Every structure is written in C-alpha cells, then in structure tokens.
Amino acid sequence: MCFIFIPADLEIGKVVASLVYAPTVVGITGNYDDVNRLCSEIAGVYPWAFANINLRPFYAEGSKTLCFEILEQLGWQAPDHLILPAAGGSLVTKAKKSLKEFHLLGLIDKPKTKIHVAQAAGCGPIVTTLKEGGDFVKPVKPDTIAKSLAIGNPADGIYA
C-alpha cells in the first residue's frame, strides 16, 4: 500500500505520474513544509518510510545529471555561470558536486563556474541567507504561486 501526501492545491500535472501506482493520495491543507512536517510526525508513529525527495539519495544524485547534460552540450567545457532554481537546495549542491566529480575523473578542466541561486520573491530563504552572509537558513512561510519552489525550510539550504 502506498500513500502520497501532497499540498491540497497542487497542480494536477504534478500528481498524474504518481497515479500509475494506484496510491492513496491525501491532500493536505498547507504547503510543502506543512506536508513534510506531517509526514515526519506520521513516520515517527507508524512503521512507514518517509520518502521525501530531500531525503532520498537517488533523487539527490539524479540531480547531478543536469550538469552532465550541460557539460556534454558544451563539448565537455564547464560553463562560466549556472543560474539554478532552488527549493530545497539539492539541485544547487549536486551541481557543485557533479562539476567536482567530472574534474576528479579528468573529464573536464578544473571548473571556475559561478553558481547563482534563484528563488521566488515570496519564498527565498536560501537567497536571503546568501545575501546576508548568514550561517544558517531561517525558515520562512512561502508566499508564491511557484509551488515547486515553495519550500520555506529547505533541507539542503545551508549547503547551497
């Protein structure tokens, strides 16, 4: 049996692919942070796994493929700049990791890529921390129509 907890107002296009496994979909009033908090509580009570994308190594490692594609398209040259959207921060951390790994494998020269983080104006805890030079990311209440970026308490934010 599979349960998928989602924000109740999530776009149907983000849900459809999951329906192929015939899960029980539970809409939660609130944003991704509210859903994550509830799932953490449920996993603490029941013997259920909480497979959040920020906690799954396969998702995180899969994020590196973005840079692999970019490097291939640029003839195995690292770009000067990358502008990446950030929700939980994993894409940013894995972009850095993938460039380093390609260099360690001898497939590219040492990258001098500058990575720029983009977040929605109403939900920018990582960008705010970077601008302020903070040591940790302060959670915010998301206020944006960009639901995929509406993570007010980003799991990998401090590493981005």
Where are these regions (language model features)?
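Beta-strand segments within the central parallel beta-sheet cores of soluble alpha/beta enzyme folds
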Residues: F5-I6, D80-P85, K110-Q119
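Short glycine/serine/threonine-rich phosphate/pyrophosphate-binding segments
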Residues: M1-F3, E11-V15, A60, P85-A95, ...
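Active-site/ligand-binding loops adjacent to catalytic centers
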Residues: G30-P47, E101-A160
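Buried hydrophobic positions in well-ordered alpha/beta secondary-structure cores of metabolic enzymes
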Residues: S18, I70, L82-I83, I115, ...
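Generic beta-sheet signal
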Residues: F5, I28, A51-I53, A118-A120
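Active-site-proximal loop->helix
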Residues: M1-E41, V127-K131
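Hydrophobic beta-strand scaffold residues
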Residues: C2, V25, A49-F50, A150
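Active-site/ligand-binding-proximal alpha/beta "capping" segment
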Residues: E41-G106
